[in-house]
Amino acid sequence: MEHYISLFVKSVFIENMALSFFLGMCTFLAVSKKVSTAFGLGVAVTVVLGISVPVNQLVYSLILKDGALIDGVDLSFLNFITFIGVIAALVQILEMILDKYFPALYNALGIFLPLITVNCAIFGGVSFMVQRDYNFAESIVYGIGAGTGWMLAIVALAGITEKMKYADVPAGLRGLGITFITVGLMALGFMSFSGVQL
């Protein structure tokens, strides 16, 4: 149990997808204007990561891994296309659920919801799972932890951005300039966790 808690904390803080690996920055920067929208997208990314990482782990270990189906047959060259297909299917299912049960969030996310399909944070989580050779239970914990870390980062950035509306930001830094500085400072803060041994 301690191993799974350690893996979760590590994936949220020490190896944060957005602030350590800078994955998923397109939606991270674009949807971080309001906390409510950022939280909704963060939950969507967490759900997709929490489902796609373990599902892709099963696909990889049972079908694509060297010798999984037949001894001597290595289908790992199909990793990228298979993982992207699984992620795309899961995002389509999530999009239909949000459209039916949460139409306000669906409309607020707009074009960024289908873009979760090509969000490199999702694919990065799946790739890290393969690279680190996580088992099924570890991939569940890692997927949820990585999504939670990404959500924590985007909600924190949205909160700071909302507060910055009342600040006197110099004209040359307004918009993306101050956002990049803020993200850099947040990344420095999260970097302080890198010395923690779990």
Curated annotation (Swiss-Prot):
Composed of six subunits; NqrA, NqrB, NqrC, NqrD, NqrE and NqrF. NCBIfam families: nqrE. Pfam families: Rnf-Nqr (PF02508). One of its GO terms (molecular function) is oxidoreductase activity, acting on NAD(P)H, quinone or similar compound as acceptor. The keyword Thylakoid does not apply. The keyword Transport applies. It is an enzyme of class 7 (translocase). InterPro entries: NqrDE/RnfAE, NqrDE/RnfAE_oxidrdctase, NqrE. Belongs to the NqrDE/RnfAE family. This is Na(+)-translocating NADH-quinone reductase subunit E. It catalyses: a ubiquinone + n Na(+)(in) + NADH + H(+) = a ubiquinol + n Na(+)(out) + NAD(+). The chain crosses the membrane at residues 11-31, 35-55, 77-97, 110-130, 140-160, 176-196. It is a multi-pass membrane protein. NQR complex catalyzes the reduction of ubiquinone-1 to ubiquinol by two successive reactions, coupled with the transport of Na(+) ions from the cytoplasm to the periplasm. NqrA to NqrE are probably involved in the second step, the conversion of ubisemiquinone to ubiquinol. It comes from Histophilus somni (strain 2336). Its EC number is 7.2.1.1. The lineage of its organism: Bacteria, Pseudomonadati, Pseudomonadota, Gammaproteobacteria, Pasteurellales. Its main location: membrane. HAMAP family: NqrE.
